[in-house]
Amino acid sequence: MENAGKATSLQSSRDLFHRLMSENSSGGWEKSWEAGATPWDLGKPTPVIAHLVETGSLPNGRALVPGCGTGYDVVAMASPDRHVVGLDISKTAVERSTKKFSTLPNAKYFSFLSEDFFTWEPAEKFDLIFDYTFFCAFEPGVRPLWAQRMEKLLKPGGELITLMFPIDERSGGPPYEVSVSEYEKVLIPLGFEAISIVDNELAVGPRKGMEKLGRWKKSSTFHSTL
């Protein structure tokens, strides 16, 4: 009965989220956070990110998590060797994450900002960017712009980690259907090389079989004309 209750609650959250997005596409994300309609929020760090942190498999330096939401992954990645910026267009999400995590021992190694990913201009570029449930939030026509921003925000030789979801057949969104080829189509022309693309064996619950972990290296010699 408990699992049935959780499933019903999750479906209700999804229904409310889609209604808010359909009513106000530009402000739907903020409305969703205000209403607590965030069905994508796991309530904990993404398991594969926790695994990569524990095994020392992430680059050090400056890291960015766009569309960070509550910020669990931001906090999990932050350390003396890695300062992490969590970016979200929702002011409510950023206020909550800042309040929730500001007293943690590693709080000086992360920060949260409410900014538009497509117009934000940070003072420094990043060594690492992690994308999960962000690429899939945009209609397919926006994906080339997403890739251009990733290229601009990463340092030469920097790494982009894409947790690809949802790899399935669906109409509409968000989340919009994704595939490996959709990432390749927009990243490879901008000088990104796929270092590895594997099934995410640590995917949670209903997302199992619908995710792949992609690790991309930005060329050290590619020069964008954008």
Swiss-Prot record:
Any idea which residues bear Phosphoserine here? Answer: 79
Which residues make up the binding site for S-adenosyl-L-methionine?
Answer: 29, 33, 40, 67, 88, 116-117, 132
InterPro entries recorded for this chain? Answer: SAM-dependent_MTases_sf, TPMT
What cellular component terms from Gene Ontology apply here?
Answer: chloroplast envelope; cytosol; peroxisome
Q: Which GO terms describe its biological process?
A: methylation
**Please, which domain of life does this record's source organism belong to?**
Eukaryota
Q: Which UniProt keywords apply?
A: Methyltransferase, Phosphoprotein, S-adenosyl-L-methionine, Transferase
**Reaction(s) catalyzed by this protein?**
a thiol + S-adenosyl-L-methionine = a methyl thioether + S-adenosyl-L-homocysteine + H(+)
Q: Which SUPFAM superfamilies match?
A: S-adenosyl-L-methionine-dependent methyltransferases
Name the EC number(s).
2.1.1.9
Give the knockout phenotype: No visible phenotype under normal growth conditions.
Q: Which GO terms describe its molecular function?
A: thiol S-methyltransferase activity
Q: Which family does it belong to?
A: Belongs to the class I-like SAM-binding methyltransferase superfamily. TPMT family.
* Alphabetical list of PANTHER family matching this protein: PTHR32183, THIOL METHYLTRANSFERASE 2-RELATED
> What is the role of the protein in this entry?
S-adenosyl-L-methionine-dependent methyltransferase.
Name of the protein this chain belongs to: Probable thiol methyltransferase 2
Source species, please? Answer: Arabidopsis thaliana (Mouse-ear cress)
Q: Mind giving the lineage of the organism this protein is from?
A: Eukaryota, Viridiplantae, Streptophyta, Embryophyta, Tracheophyta
The gene that this protein is the product of is HOL3
